[in-house]
């Protein structure tokens, strides 16, 4: 670590302590060239998922955006807030476990639909209609037919 007083890279750690919650490590260091003591902190750097939108722009992954979309599709339906949060958490966990740090928005939409379909077919259809930009009644008929054929 570079000494803030003399700029030397020659130092030693004289004390190390972990924060109460275990997320930060505090280290007291001493410069071996000038004797100056200074403190450094180490924190875990979370991996950030980036979403590539349909128009080509990117934005940080936002679980709240998923929850808002599900909430709109599930208005007056038997889908609890807890279930909505669980869906968003499961999607984030899946993406991180798969190492997908850049993900297409369409993949996120597909994952939401897959999970919502298991909970409430009506909420699923509402979400699908907005997400897939249904243009007329035929789009709804096609989606309903798919649900019926799969016995859901």
From Swiss-Prot:
GO BP terms in the entry: negative regulation of DNA-templated transcription
PROSITE patterns, sorted: ATP_CONE
Entry function: Negatively regulates transcription of bacterial ribonucleotide reductase nrd genes and operons by binding to NrdR-boxes.
PANTHER family linked to this entry: TRANSCRIPTIONAL REPRESSOR NRDR
Cofactors: Zn(2+)
Keyword annotations: ATP-binding, DNA-binding, Metal-binding, Nucleotide-binding, Repressor, Transcription, Transcription regulation, Zinc, Zinc-finger
Protein name, entry field: Transcriptional repressor NrdR
Cofactor binding mode and count: Binds 1 zinc ion.
Isomerase listed as a keyword: no
UniProt record similarity statement: Belongs to the NrdR family.
Zinc finger boundaries on the chain: unnamed: 3-34
GO MF entry, a single one: ATP binding
UniProt domain ATP-cone: residue ranges: 49-139
Annotated source species: Persephonella marina (strain DSM 14350 / EX-H1)
């Amino acid at each position: 670590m570079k000494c803030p007083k003399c700029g030397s890279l020659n130092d030693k750690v004289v004390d190390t302590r972990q924060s109460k919650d275990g997320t930060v490590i505090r280290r007291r260091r001493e410069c071996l060239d000038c004797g100056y003591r200074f403190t450094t902190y180490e924190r875990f750097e979370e991996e950030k998922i980036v979403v590539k939108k349909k128009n080509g722009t990117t934005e940080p992954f936002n679980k709240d955006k998923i929850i808002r979309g599900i909430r709109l599709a599930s208005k007056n339906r038997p889908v609890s807030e807890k279930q909505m949060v669980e869906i968003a958490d499961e999607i984030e966990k899946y993406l991180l476990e798969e190492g997908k740090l850049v993900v297409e928005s369409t993949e996120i939409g597909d994952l939401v639909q897959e999970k919502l379909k298991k909970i409430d077919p009506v909420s699923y259809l509402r979400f699908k209609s907005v997400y897939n930009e249904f243009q007329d009644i035929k789009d709804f008929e096609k989606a309903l037919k798919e649900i019926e054929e799969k016995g859901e």
